Swiss-Prot record:
The species this protein was found in: Aspergillus fumigatus (strain ATCC MYA-4609 / CBS 101355 / FGSC A1100 / Af293)
Main location: endoplasmic reticulum
Name under which the protein is recorded: COPII coat assembly protein sec16
Lineage: Eukaryota, Fungi, Dikarya, Ascomycota, Pezizomycotina
Keyword set, alphabetical order: Autophagy, Endoplasmic reticulum, ER-Golgi transport, Membrane, Protein transport, Transport
Residue ranges, compositional bias (Pro residues): 510-524, 653-665, 1725-1736, 1757-1769
Sequence ranges of Polar residues compositional bias: 57-74, 123-133, 422-457, 528-546, 590-603, 679-688, 738-747, 845-854, 1428-1439, 1513-1538, 1550-1559
Transmembrane segments: none
């Protein structure tokens, strides 16, 4: 007590020093009330800034006031308990309380002086931060810079700063602070009784006080200036707050540190509990000193304030109670120091006791833990301090001191909370911890070092955890507040909170928590929970301070207010707060005030955590949970926190982070949750904070939040590594910039210490529990980011991140992205889990530090997805059974149909939503959509080259265009990349080069008009292609010159050195030759390597010897010389004549067999790939071309085959082309070397390669060069026509119809021009061309929409003239009528009436006649020839029916494949004939029967036509080659050779007859419809006969084809016997007819004249005649006696009574040969026996013409083969027009009776009525001789 008195004597001068904490409280009170300033000038001076903060907060202000006034009563005891590390402090405050009040009284008495002194001193403290008027304060002021480090470390850095202080002057400062805290705190609380307070202080810290007061004395003089005292009072308080008090405590400890420590431990223990309880209960007196200290710190931006603030809840109560007296002046009258000490100790003790109950289970656990661990903690702390560097011990003392002075009032509690915060690190990261990190700074520093030890040890963590929990909660509030306070939060001081990492030191205590955080196990939680529970309780008690805090929250600057609130809550968190305090450095007062009232003020920076912390934001808590588990376990929140393992809720947190991003909600949560709860929540949210930070930066201050965290990352990069998971915290800090700056500032001094401590922490986090530990470390991190409490989730990540904090420094870019990139904001989880490893730029991750958030709570990212899943609507199922479809096609699906010409029809379903009653969501009804027609090119445009192909290549004018096109393609190949699927092939590049080379060779071939030899330019071009790098010395240099390397040339003046020769060998050789043994001499020379001698001798020997010598030379000399002599060796072999063996030099036979042979001679075998010789093919070809030898082309072919065997197709084709003997052929030709250039037809995996347009066009270019340009009139590649048709189809499919039509025309022209039809010119080709042409004509519009787009005579005749011509007889109308009528004539008798039908027949006949082969083709070939057997059974029975249908109408398919059976050859062919596409071709275009079958069927084969046609088609195909040769005038070319007989086999009899009667003109009687053999030219003779018979028919010779002549031949036999009678008869009948006609004309002359125009002449007279019923004069034929039957209205043959039958059914066979022919035709094939074919020579041509479509030529040839049935044939011919319809079944449509042998068309022909007629009548079809005599 003497000391107090002495101190009291000192009070006037030393009050600032001794009563640093008291002065701080007084200063705060002074700030609140000016009068208090005088008394608390010293104390207030130091605490002034905190006082301001407390002033802002009512509770805090009261605490300050209480500190100033009641400090003597409560402040001293509380301060003693809180600050006194040992029981000494606690006891001394009690004993000193009386003195303290007296001291306070004297202080108040000396208030003026004190104020003056404090004013003076305050100036210094204000400048120094914590320096107070007291000398001790001055010492502390000296240390203040260090202390400010602690202040900076108020957050995480606070601990480090405290450590630094302890290590440096801080240690002394802590001692002094400790002493001062003991005394100063007492004084602060008993400011009124400062003497007593100083006495107690003197007892405990006399030595320190002396030193400190001595310092103050030096400063006291200036301090005494009263005016400045008040001003300094406010400023001095901060200086005095932590600076002096800790120094006093430390000084006191210096005197009896051990005792003090124990005393403090007891007091601290009780005081700590008291503080916890008081914080919970908002009891101010004990924490007054701390409270005022925190206020001081807050005002100073000191770090430790926040920690004190949390411990100040009781102090806040004291301050509040003291504040009133202070305001009333009661501060001076406040109880004596003894009273204050008693109250203080009682308060602390009571509070501790109360706190435990208040915490409920946590309180019990906490006190139990503290009871057990109190001493242990203190011992551990002390031990830790002992073990730790002095700095650490000092830190602990400073924590004690700070706890005495500030809410951390009880050093023990602080130390314990320190440990607890460590264990409870997750809570420490909470706002309160981070913010209150400054008081915790001691704890933080201590825990950082010791606590890290402790952190590994679970005991310490529980206490710090609890504190942190509260601090976190308060900080969460603070953080929430910070959003409102964003401007201040932006301040770096909050980054000091980041020094909460110092809390990482507390994680030393955290060891238990880490397991919790990771697993959230109860044990870690217990450890941390025990202390947290009291903390939570105290925080609960300080709920009022929390209210103050909330009140303060709106006032971020006056965080001292919130600090008091938070102090109560923060008291347990104080240790943790120490680190966080640095973050709150920007609002040091706030932090300090957090200590007194609501650490949440400090939490101001932690506000972001609060934002995150809001329990509602479980995700954040979860995110924090991983780290938090340990921390949360400490407080009741711990359990809650532990349930939140960030892992699970972390995912949830990200969504809350948006919620959290708004600071207000989280502040509400912070408020709602007890400091502990919030703290626990906040740790949980810390893990989630990563996500929250993302959002928080947005709602709160994104820049502050994000930036702050990033600063922490930078400054505390070491710790950051752990924070990486809490990467989002940077955004939180960003939202609370003030804390963030603090964090960085704290980092500076204490942050470093913290980091030093943190590494252990980070080391701990390395273990899975690291997350729990990380929560502590992360709590530090969180403290650093506490301001951005919203970084809670990231903080969770911090758990592991602190260790990775250093790693996070790389995340400075994220810091840059503090603006919080939206992506990170949107998906904080991403930042939490993934960012940690990647360390992406902040911009990528948004506000949160991506890496930090990544930590254990990466799961949090999952919730990051903000978009809601799109609603899936159900379909309305049908009720008609479709719902059972497993494919659910009733739901609709796009439909595409690809049509001809590149047309695409598409239809997409429409999904129409339909609503029904009782359903909230609509259901989908699928309906058909719009049908659209588009072009395929619109969707899939074909790759078009720069130059369009000029095809079809018809004339030399195309050369230039073709060269340009080839050049463009070559350039495209050279510039194109190798396809991906070819890149794996080692030869891909080689193959591309060879392909390009092939195209270049073809270009050279085109440029040189198909000649590659004999031209210097061509040779040079080839040389340049094969050897692009070759340098020619002259134009005449050969390709072989390339291989003479200049380096090997000897100088001209160099002496020649002959090879060494063994004279004995030469002598032996000579002796051998003398004996005449040349062969022996040769081999002797070879053995001696005398190659010159051996070759000279062998040159005159057998060639085989020469070849062997050369081969041996090559093997022994050439091959072994170098590795690149394969080409030379091969060339030597070729020169030697070893053609087949030459390729062995390139690739040995063993290699081709798959063996690898090793040469024993040179040993080079295994070192070289035996297949490398293939690459020498170009050199070999060049040598051969430059040095031609007799059989070198064979060598090139062999080389090509070798290359082809190794899939070098293009190289092989180049060799084939250059060899000039390669065989081009179809796929079916086994001898063909090339089918299409660039296509290996021998290894076709599919036919797709044959549809390659490039290959087709390249082959066409080759053909063009070798035929057109070379002057050849004949196509050299007949097989290419089919591929041209394929190309035409492809053009049509791409919509290029005009070009496709051009190709069709070109193919047709080539077929016509061919004099030697090839086997490849088959009916399939004809039908395919015809079909494509017809479809193109149908679908192609020639440009106009008008009905006559292109006026042309052809179309006009087809449309108009055909109608008129249909009534006109004669061949003139056939061409036109054929085209127009063919579609109309369906049945054999369609258009039978009148001569039109007849007239048409002749025209068709002409067409076929013009085609030589057509005439030769037999009827049978017509039908099926094309479809062979199938066509026999073609649907249409009669060829006429099909013929009537246009070729397009025919059944053939549009596919490239040509439908064999779909259409009747006869029918369709006839159509082509009509179209005149294949006038000569019809025999091919249509089964010969088709075109000509019309004639034979018309005669007697009409009934048989269908069958005959089918079989005939088969036969015709058999005879296609025959046809071609028939055109060659080969009478009977084996039809079977080309077309299979099976087609004719259906009519075996016919086939037999065919074989038996091939000579009869190759036409088999209808019976042998099968095989048709081209009629022999003998038919020509008979055709001449027919001509004679029908000499009257001028057109007959024209009409006649070979077939017609054959008909004549057939009729010749009968002609001898019948002609005479027939002629007479016909003459008579003709006379009668003419007479009748004349009479009719006489009767009707006017009508005839009445007709107008020349048409009237045609139609009028004739029609009149016909209409009149009078016969028209016409030559009826020899044997025919026709008369016009008026009843039947037709001409009737008298000799054929059946002809008079009115029915058109097949009339009875005409008498004579006609009936047999008819019956034969009806039988399906004319009986082979028919010796005389009906005179179908002419008639056949006619019927074919009448058929309208060139039926197969078989019709005309048929007559010769149908010797017997000729009458029928003529008949069919006469009905030719009709006949084509039933060519296959002439019986169904019986042909008109044919006049016996006469070629003249009979009346039947003229009438066209189906009547049995004699074959000869067919010849009557001649156009000129027929008159339309049809009677109507």
């Amino acid at each position: 007590m003497a000391q107090p008195e002495g101190v009291l004597a000192w009070n006037p001068a030393f009050r600032p020093e001794d009563n640093d904490s008291v002065a701080t409280d007084l200063a705060r009170l002074a700030l609140d009330s000016g009068k208090e300033v005088s008394e608390t000038t010293d104390v207030d001076t130091h605490v002034s800034p905190p006082a301001e903060e407390f002033t802002d907060e009512n509770g805090s202000i009261e605490s300050k006031t209480a500190i100033s006034a009641d400090t003597s009563d409560q402040g001293a005891p509380d301060l003693v308990d809180s600050n006194t590390p040992a029981a000494d402090n606690g006891s001394k405050p009690d004993t000193e309380e009386p003195d303290k009040p007296s001291r306070d009284e004297s202080i108040f008495m000396q208030t003026d002086k004190s104020r003056a002194v404090e004013d003076v001193t305050e100036n210094v403290p204000t400048e120094n931060g914590n320096v107070d008027i007291t000398s001790g304060l001055e010492e502390h002021v000296a240390e203040e810079p260090h202390y400010e480090g602690p202040e900076k470390s108020t957050g995480l850095a606070g601990r480090n700063d405290a450590q630094d202080l302890f290590e440096g002057n801080d240690t002394a400062w802590m001692d002094e602070a400790e002493g001062e805290v003991n005394g100063a705190t007492v004084n602060g609380e008993a400011s009124g009784t400062r003497p007593g307070f100083w006495d107690s202080l003197g007892d405990n810290e006399r030595d320190n006080e002396d030193d400190f007061f001595n310092q103050l004395k030096t400063q006291t003089k200036p301090i005494y200036s009263p005016p400045e005292t008040e001003a300094r009072f406010e400023e001095g308080i901060p200086l005095l707050g932590q600076g002096a008090a800790p120094q006093n405590n430390h000084a006191h400890k210096g005197e009896s540190q051990v005792d003090d420590v124990f005393g403090d431990d007891e007091d601290d223990e009780s005081g700590f509990f008291s503080e916890i309880q008081k914080r919970t209960s908002a009891e101010g007196p004990p924490p007054i000193t701390r409270k005022s200290t925190s206020q001081v710190i807050d005002s100073i931006n000191a770090v430790s304030d926040s920690m004190f603030s949390k411990q100040l809840p009781a102090a806040a109560e004291l301050n509040n109670s003291l504040a009133v007296p202070t305001a009333d002046g009661e501060i001076k009258n406040s109880p004596s120091e003894e009273d204050l000490a008693a109250r203080w100790q009682a308060e602390l003790s009571d509070d501790a006791d109360e706190t435990m109950p208040t915490e409920d289970d946590l309180a019990a656990r906490w006190q139990a833990e503290l009871d057990d661990d109190d001493d242990d903690l203190l011992l551990d702390d002390d031990t830790t301090n002992a073990q730790r560097p002095p700095e650490a011990a000092n830190i602990d003392h400073m924590n004690d001191t700070s706890m005495l002075q500030s809410p951390f009032g009880t050093p023990e509690n602080l130390a314990r909370p320190k440990v607890q915060p460590v264990s409870y690190t997750p809570h420490q990261p909470s706002t309160s911890d981070l913010l209150s990190g400054i008081p915790a700074q001691n704890t933080a520093a201590q825990p950082t070092n010791a606590s890290m030890s402790s952190y590994f040890s679970a005991q310490a963590p529980p206490n710090p955890v609890t504190t942190r929990a509260e601090s976190f909660a308060e900080r969460s509030k603070e953080g929430y507040k910070s959003p409102y306070d964003i401007p201040e939060d932006l301040a770096r001081p909050r980054r000091a909170v980041a020094n909460s990492r110092t809390v990482v030191a507390q994680p030393g205590t955290v060891p238990k928590p880490p397991p919790r955080s990771s697993s959230i196990p109860a044990p870690p939680l217990k450890a941390s929970t025990v202390s947290p529970a009291p903390l939570g309780t105290s925080s609960t008690a300080p709920t009022a301070p929390q209210k103050n805090f909330f009140e303060e929250l709106p006032l971020p600057p006056p965080r001292p207010k919130s600090r008091p609130a938070s102090s109560g809550r923060y008291t347990p968190n104080a240790p943790v707060s120490a680190p966080s305090l640095p973050q709150s450095i920007p609002p040091p007062a706030n932090q300090y005030s957090n200590v007194p009232g609501a650490p949440q003020s400090n939490i101001g920076p932690p506000d972001p955590p609060q934002l995150q912390q809001p329990e509602r934001l479980d995700p954040y808590s979860n995110l924090l949970a991983p780290n938090v588990p340990s921390a949360p376990a400490v407080p009741s929140t711990a359990s809650r926190y532990s349930p939140r393992p960030p892992g699970v809720q972390a995912g949830v947190k990200p969504p809350p982070s948006p919620r959290y991003s708004p600071a207000p909600p989280q502040s509400t949560n912070a408020v709602a949750a007890a400091p502990r709860n919030r703290y626990a929540s906040q740790p949980a949210s810390i893990s989630g904070q990563g996500a929250a930070l993302q959002f928080q930066p947005r709602t709160s201050s994104p820049l502050a939040y994000h930036e702050k965290i990033h600063y922490e990352d930078q400054g505390q990069s070491e710790e950051r590594p752990q924070l990486q998971s809490t990467a989002s915290p940077p955004p939180l800090n960003h939202s609370h910039p003030s804390e963030q700056p603090v964090s960085s500032e704290n980092k500076g001094p204490s942050g470093v210490d913290v980091l030093e401590n943190v590494p252990p922490l980070s080391t701990r986090p390395q273990s899975p529990p690291k997350n729990p530990y990380a929560p502590s470390a992360y709590t530090n991190e969180f403290a650093n980011r506490v301001a951005p409490v919203s970084t809670g989730p990231p903080i969770a990540g911090m758990t592991g991140v602190l260790n990775s904090s250093t790693e996070e420094s790389p995340f400075v870019p994220p810091r840059r992205s503090q603006t919080q990139s939206p992506s990170q904001t949107l998906s904080p989880r991403l930042s939490v889990p993934s960012l940690d490893p990647f360390q992406r730029p902040a911009s990528v991750h948004g506000s949160t530090s991506p890496t930090r958030t990544v930590n254990p709570y990466a799961p949090a990212p999952v919730p990051t997805h903000n978009r809601a899943p799109s609603q899936v609507l159900e379909f309305i199922p049908p009720t008609d059974g479709q719902q059972l479809d497993s494919l659910e096609r009733w739901k609709g699906a796009p439909i595409f149909k690809f049509g001809f010409g590149g047309a695409v029809i598409s239809c997409f379903p429409k999904h129409i939503p339909r609503y029904s009653a009782g359903q909230a969501a609509p259901m989908i009804k699928s309906c058909p959509g719009e049908v659209r027609i588009s072009q395929l090119n619109d969707w899939l445009p074909a790759a078009e080259g720069i130059v369009q192909h000029p095809g079809p290549l018809k004339g030399k004018s195309k050369k230039k265009d073709l060269v340009a096109w080839l050049s463009s393609k070559i350039a495209a190949f050279e510039n194109a990349d190798i396809p991906d699927f070819d890149r794996l092939s080692p030869d891909a590049s080689k193959l591309r080069e060879e392909k390009t080379l092939l195209w270049k060779v073809i270009r050279v071939l085109v440029e040189n008009d198909g000649v590659l030899e004999g031209s210097v330019e061509a040779q040079k071009s080839l040389r340049n292609l094969l050897f692009p790098n070759l340098q020619d010395s002259g134009p005449n240099q050969s390709l072989g010159d390339v291989f003479t390397p200049s380096a090997t040339l000897q100088p001209l003046n160099a002496p020649s050195q002959p090879d060494a020769v063994d004279s004995r060998s030469v002598d032996l050789l000579r002796d051998t030759l003398v004996l005449g043994e040349r062969e022996k001499a040769v081999w002797a020379a070879v053995d001696k390597r005398l190659w010159g001698h051996a070759m000279i001798i062998a040159s005159r020997m057998d060639r085989s010897v020469w070849q062997q010598v050369v081969q041996e030379f090559v093997r022994r000399e050439v091959r072994s010389a170098t590795s690149r002599t394969e080409s030379l060796a091969a060339f030597y072999e070729i020169l030697a004549g070893n053609i087949e063996e030459s390729i062995d030099e390139l690739v040995p036979p063993s290699a081709r067999a798959g063996l690898q042979m090793i040469s024993k001679v040179d040993g080079h075998g295994p070192a070289k790939n035996s297949l490398d010789g293939l690459d020498s093919w170009r050199e070999t070809v060049g040598l051969v071309l430059s040095n031609r030898s007799p059989d070198d082309q064979r060598a090139l072919v062999a080389l090509g085959r070798l290359l082809l065997s190794y899939n070098r197709t293009e190289a092989a084709h180049i060799c084939f082309i250059l060899s000039r003997v390669a065989v081009f052929g179809g796929l079916d030709d086994p001898q063909a070397n090339i089918v299409l250039l660039g296509v290996d037809h021998q290894r076709l995996s599919s036919c797709a390669a044959l549809y390659n347009d490039d290959s087709i066009l390249l082959t066409e270019a080759y053909e063009f060069a070798t035929s057109v340009l070379a002057g050849s009139s004949v196509s050299t590649l007949p097989h290419l026509l089919a591929f041209k048709l394929i190309h035409a189809w492809s053009l049509a499919e791409r919509g290029r119809k005009s070009e496709a039509q051009q190709y069709c025309d070109a193919i047709a022209a080539a077929l016509k021009a061919t004099t030697k039809p090839s086997g490849y010119h088959n009916q399939h080709l004809f039908f395919g061309v015809d079909e494509l042409s017809a479809r193109l004509r149908e679908t192609t519009s020639d440009g106009g929409s008008s009905w006559i787009s292109r006026p042309s005579m052809e179309k006009v005749s087809g449309s108009m003239w055909a109608k008129f011509n249909s009534f006109v007889a004669g061949d003139d109308s056939d061409a036109a009528s054929t085209g127009s009528v063919k579609a109309e004539e369906i049945g054999p008798f369609a258009r039978v009436s009148g001569t039109p039908t007849i007239s048409r027949s002749p025209s068709v006949s002409d067409i076929y006649g013009s085609y030589p082969v057509a005439a030769a083709q037999p009827l049978p070939a017509t039908g099926p020839s094309r479809y062979q057997p199938v066509s026999q059974y073609a649907p249409s029975a009669s060829p006429e029916q099909l013929r009537g249908r246009s070729s397009m109408d025919s059944q053939r398919s549009a596919s490239f494949g040509y439908p064999l059976g779909q259409r009747r050859g006869s029918q369709e062919p006839s159509t082509p004939v009509d179209t005149n596409m294949f006038h000569g071709m019809p025999m091919y275009g249509s089964p010969p029967v088709a075109g000509y079958q019309s004639t034979p069927p018309q005669s007697s084969y009409m009934p048989l036509a269908p069958v005959a046609e089918d079989s005939a088609s088969g036969a015709q195909q058999e005879s296609f080659s025959a046809h071609s040769q028939v055109s060659d005038n080969a009478p009977s070319h084996r039809s079977s050779t080309y077309a299979p007989e099976p087609f004719g086999h259906p009519f075996d009899t016919q086939a037999v007859s065919t074989t038996s009667q091939p000579d009869q003109g190759g036409y088999m009687p209808p019976t042998s419809s099968g095989a048709y053999e081209p009629p022999s030219f003998e038919s020509n003779t008979e055709s001449a006969d027919g001509a004679q018979d029908e000499s009257t028919e001028e057109d007959k010779p024209k009409k006649k084809s070979i077939m017609d002549e054959d008909d004549d031949e057939d009729l010749a036999a009968r002609a001898a016997a019948i002609q005479k009678a027939e002629r007479a008869r016909r003459d008579r009948e003709a006379d009668e007819a003419f007479r009748k006609a004349a009479e009719a004309d006489a009767k009707k002359p006017p009508p005839a004249t009445g007709k107008k125009g020349w048409f009237s002449g045609w139609f009028g007279g004739k029609k009149d005649d016909n209409s009149g019923g009078g016969p028209i004069r016409a030559k009826l034929g020899e044997e025919n006696s026709f008369y016009y039957d008026t009843e039947l209205k037709k001409w009737v043959n008298k000799k054929d009574p059946g002809s008079a039958a009115p029915t058109r059914g097949t009339p009875p066979p005409p008498k004579g040969s006609a009936p047999p022919s008819r019956s034969m035709s009806g039988s399906g094939g004319p009986p082979p026996a028919m010796a005389t074919p009906p005179p179908t020579g002419a008639s056949g041509s006619r019927p074919s013409s009448s058929a309208g479509a060139p039926t197969s030529v078989s019709a005309s040839p048929a007559p010769p083969s149908l010797g017997a049935p000729p009458p029928a044939i003529p008949r069919s011919v006469s009905t030719g027009a009709v006949l084509p319809t039933p060519p296959s079944s002439s019986a169904g449509a019986p042909p008109r009776p044919a006049t016996s042998l006469s070629n003249a068309s009979s009346i039947d022909d003229l009438l066209g009525a189906p009547q049995a007629r004699k074959g000869p009548a067919a010849r009557g079809k001649k156009k000129g001789r027929y008159v339309d005599v049809m009677a109507k």
